[in-house]
Amino acid sequence: MSVTLHTTHGDLKVELFCEAVPKTAENFIALCAAGAYNDTPFHRLIPGFMIQGGDISLGPAANSQGTTPMLPFDDIPKGGTSIYHPSALNQEIHLPALRHNTRGILSMASRPVKNQTAPGSQGATGPTINGSQFFITFAAAPHLDGSSTVFGKVLNLTAEDEGGDVLSKLEKANVKTDKKGKVVQPKENEETEYETLRINRVTIHANPFAT
């Protein structure tokens, strides 16, 4: 199945590997369906490596004055979380089938487990778990194989004005970043040369988990 990320720099259509990583795919699709990714920033950009987003605690879902996304929990913790919160979303590593072997790979940004009894980490089976954050590679990143869950890929990377062109626009965006690649987003109505990097909304083309 596929979804389209409507970003500030164009549309990215991505294929999801639902059969290979069902829990991870279900989490991503459910967050998309709930509107949790709407108006959230790409908060990290490292050209030649990856762009990272999906922190639902940085969007209106966490501080909504209007419609609140239908999520199975009340409060969104800092950094975001999975739909299984307070239980953990464990890694679904599949080597050698699913690897960070090319440009346009969609993968989860994991975080370390510090306390297995803490909300979001309950039931963790490994040293790291997943939440809501994800990244898209700009190049092969084999050092991440075995440590991050690959769950999709950008489609139409060779087509002009489609996935490949948009991914290039995101990679080349004029943004202000710190030494770790964290993007300093321009403030609303601020006059600046720097660009905003954001997911505006998401379109789900087919949801195999819908009931």
UniProtKB/Swiss-Prot annotation:
One of its GO terms (biological process) is protein folding. Its EC number is 5.2.1.8. GO terms for cellular component: catalytic step 2 spliceosome. GO terms for molecular function: peptidyl-prolyl cis-trans isomerase activity. Pfam families: Pro_isomerase. It is an enzyme of class 5 (isomerase). It catalyses: [protein]-peptidylproline (omega=180) = [protein]-peptidylproline (omega=0). Residues 1-204 form the PPIase cyclophilin-type domain. Keywords: Isomerase, Rotamase. PANTHER family: PEPTIDYL-PROLYL CIS-TRANS ISOMERASE-LIKE 3, PEPTIDYL-PROLYL CIS-TRANS ISOMERASE-RELATED. PPIases accelerate the folding of proteins. It catalyzes the cis-trans isomerization of proline imidic peptide bonds in oligopeptides. Belongs to the cyclophilin-type PPIase family. PPIL3 subfamily. This is Peptidyl-prolyl cis-trans isomerase-like 3.
